[in-house]
Amino acid sequence: MKVALIAPQMWVHESYCRSSDHLFRKSGANTGNFAFVHALWSHLSPHVEIFPWEASPEMMRERCDIIVMACANQLGPHSNLEQLAITFERAKLPILAIGLGAQARELGATVELTAGTRRWLDVVAAHAPANAPNIGVRGEFSRQQVEHNGQRDRAMVTGCPSNLINPDPSLANRIDERHRLGRVERVAVPAGLHHWVKLAKIERVLVDIVEQTSGLYIAQSEIDMIRMARADWDNMDDATFHSLRNYVRPGLSDDDFRLWCKRHATCFIDAASWMESMRTFDFVAGPRFHGVMLAMQAGTPGGVIAHDSRTLEMCETMIIPVRMHDDMPASFAASDLPSLFEFEAAAYDRRRSELANRYVDMLTAAGIAPSVGLLGLTRSESAAPAPVALQRTPELAAAS
């Protein structure tokens, strides 16, 4: 069965001679997206082809048998997926949505959808390839929001597929061994944003640690953070430059801040090189979930500083070390990171296997053969029998 994977690019070709704007656009406006696109590609290969959101539905139907959409936090009033709903209706193919999350100020709040996103949700649910859930969500809160919006039996908690990149079933033990050593000589920080005022003091402490440990400050989003990481100063106005400097390193002169960025700031153009780099670090901590997740997939301990419901939900679902930003101490050192972010190896290992089982069940129910690496993360004794998949979904009337 050939899969049409609706997703940003897995990597940016010839990024060295491309603009920061090109890199940012191809990443889907956040380089953290490389993590789950890499995961889905590896789990679905070799019978998979990536299509952008604006792809022709006729082309997808001609070349593929099923659609798998790499989702993010699309459940919320900030999102309007009307055009994608129309594309999916016209493609007339079975659909899986993987990694869907809800965005709210706090867990427990009710998320209201735009009419376009509600239509998209109805279209995805109606194109289920089997008599089984076809929407993999990030956590229980997101599952409840799918149910609240009329799709009671369509969603299943699978977490984020980036949690299953590394095919080593003993990954938890590898992370735990390094975590227990407690020796933190080099730290990487997946950076926040210069307008996240509530995180400013914490970010400066993290930046101090980066400097003290010859570490890295990794930009993921927004475009000006990417420009900063690539020394793309000519495409940045003075006001933005000074806003960045005042957030990251307010005590430095303009020239010294540029030099600091050359030494410590970076961004990545694919998940593989990102994980390879993280192997050489002792700890990774910051407000970006996927920046921490990629480090953990490389066997490096990490912790997420959460500041919203979507980040907290993912961490709690997958047993990723996490602290809310307002629970962080005012001052801390690199050596404090392992105790601030305790790693529950046995719990992480069990949950990782449980989520892998659910994810594999969803794929096999749809008639998709999971990769050998993904299958190796499951525990066959707890896997449910796979329902029979349908080859095609009949044409769906436009959902209102």
Where do the model's predicted regions map?
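Active-site anion-handling motifs in enzyme catalytic cores
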Residues: 1-400
